Regions:
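Short glycine-rich phosphate-binding loop at a beta-alpha junction
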Residues: 53-59, 182-184, 286-292
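Glycine-rich phosphate-binding loop
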Residues: 103-111, 115-117, 237-259, 264, ...
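Proline/glycine-rich low-complexity loops and linkers
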Residues: 137-169, 173, 261-334, 338-340
């Protein structure tokens, strides 16, 4: 079966390119980018990735259907075929790309951003990310220079492809006996609704929140990193006396967790906790990836288990590639992305949640609580990321580095994503936002007093010299 789309698009020479970023294409729909951009990105993907077949999925946002139609028309006008999987989570597209051997794929989504946003995540062979440096920058250049988009003499066709059953079968292999585990699960009105009940069931001990697809996200923004968005889940955990709370973002590539007391758990600590599954249950003592913001406690917990830690840049375009390069077993980021060798070195909110629920169920059988297991990992006081609005980001970063390295000699230094500078009793990371005039600062110390002292120094320095505001 195939069908052809009929879509009228006004092709322009100039296009609003404000949506091209380091990891993907994303911005306010109709303001930062439009149908013209969507069409042209679709048109240039086959040439960029040398693909004659492109897998395409989309999330449930209100604008996703029209973007989908524009992207598909661009791909087929360029002469490539489209395999349309319809509504999908982003990891479903990764699965489809790698499992069925596609050389290119597009997921239409703005992930965790508010409803007025939309975007595209592009992947190539084996679900490898195509970020700005790996090809999206070339697409932008072609659009900027007005490269022609003539319709191919032989237009591509559009085929419907069903992958959900295969995806669920793949994921069910990782589910162990969850026993009488009580779980509260916030689906954020997003794409986790496609699979959560199929995987975790609908028994009375699984309590779902916002379990309908609604691209307006009427209950909260689909971003679990914003504290208030987790309040309903935290309340539900306490109400039903759940053993764990789970919350997905809009496209279900990220997931975060709440303990049985309704307290948010920092995602980097869950990288460490996963050692109970990968090392404790499966005996996999290989390399583990963490981002440059991760607590020192993660490595201090996993290294004695026989794991080798690898620290790297923030963002899927970097993390998934690095995990593949080092043949790592698993990894994660402070933003709630978790990457797995078992999942084509890509991130999956579903697989991460399955693994954590397996761990919590095992803890419960041992008479232990999730909060107790996390307490065995935490060793430091941590600021979390603090955003400073500043125009001269590089100058401000250099000033912070110079200020502290003049006081004492670092015990470790990294400069591949901003700066991470470590001292005997504290460390900090300062890095620029890729999309906004912000510096992101995070520090960790052995005591609360030391932590507050260093934050105060940064506040003062950035305010006085750069006019920075939080």
């Amino acid at each position: 079966m195939f069908f052809l789309l009929s879509l009228q698009i006004d092709i322009k020479t100039e296009s609003n390119m404000g949506a091209f970023h380091a990891y993907d294409i994303r911005g306010v729909w109709g303001k930062d980018w439009d149908l013209d951009t969507a069409y042209k990105v679709g048109y240039f993907i086959p040439a960029l990735l040398k693909a004659d077949k492109v897998l395409v999925g989309r999330d449930c946002r209100v604008s996703s259907d029209e973007i989908h139609d524009a992207v598909v028309k661009g791909i087929t006008d360029a002469g490539a075929d489209v395999y349309d999987i319809g509504l999908s989570s982003t990891p479903m597209v990764y699965f489809g790309t790698a499992n069925y051997g596609f050389d290119a794929s597009v997921q239409i989504t703005a992930s965790h951003n508010p409803a007025e946003y939309n975007g595209m995540k592009v992947s190539t062979t084996d679900a490898q990310a195509v970020g700005y440096d790996a090809g999206l920058g070339q697409v932008k250049a072609w659009i900027d220079e007005g490269r022609p988009t003539p319709v191919s003499a032989v237009r591509g066709q559009v085929y419907r492809k069903e992958i959900l059953a295969d995806y669920l079968a793949f994921m069910r292999k990782f589910v162990k006996d969850l026993g009488d585990l009580t779980v509260a699960m916030d689906l954020s009105n997003g794409m986790a609704n496609l699979f959560a009940k199929e995987i975790f069931g609908t028994d009375d001990n699984i309590h779902y929140l916002f379990d309908t697809l609604d691209g307006r996200f009427p209950n909260h923004e689909p971003n679990p990193l914003i504290e208030k968005n987790c309040y309903p889940l935290e309340e539900k955990v306490r109400e039903v006396k759940a053993d764990v709370g789970v919350i997905y973002d809009g496209d279900a590539d990220r997931v975060m967790f709440v303990d049985e007391q309704g307290r948010f758990i920092s995602p980097d600590l869950m990288i460490a906790l996963m050692g109970r599954y990968f090392v404790g249950e499966r005996g996999l003592k290989g390399k583990v990836l963490q981002d440059i913001r991760s607590s020192k406690a993660v490595g201090e917990y996993l290294t004695p288990m026989g794991c080798e830690m690898q620290t790297w840049k923030v963002g899927r375009a970097f993390a998934a590639k690095k995990l593949r390069e080092i043949d790592g077993v698993w990894g994660g980021e402070l933003a709630g992305h978790y990457y797995f060798r078992d999942f084509f070195y890509s991130d999956s909110g579903l697989l991460a949640s399955i693994i954590i629920l397996n761990i919590v169920a095992a803890l419960k059988r041992e008479g232990k609580k999730l909060s107790e297991a996390v307490a065995g990992i935490v060793r430091y006081e941590n600021s979390g990321e603090i955003n400073y609005r500043v125009e001269d980001k590089q100058g401000a970063m250099d000033a912070v580095k110079a200020h502290f390295t003049a006081q004492e000699t670092p015990s470790a230094f990294m400069d591949f994503d901003g700066y991470r500078v470590e001292f005997p009793d504290w460390w900090f990371n300062i890095r620029p936002s890729n999309t906004e005039p912000y510096l992101r600062f995070l520090c960790e110390a052995t005591t609360r007093e030391r932590l507050q002292e260093k934050i105060a120094e940064v506040d003062s320095l950035l305010s006085e010299r750069f006019g920075a505001k939080r």
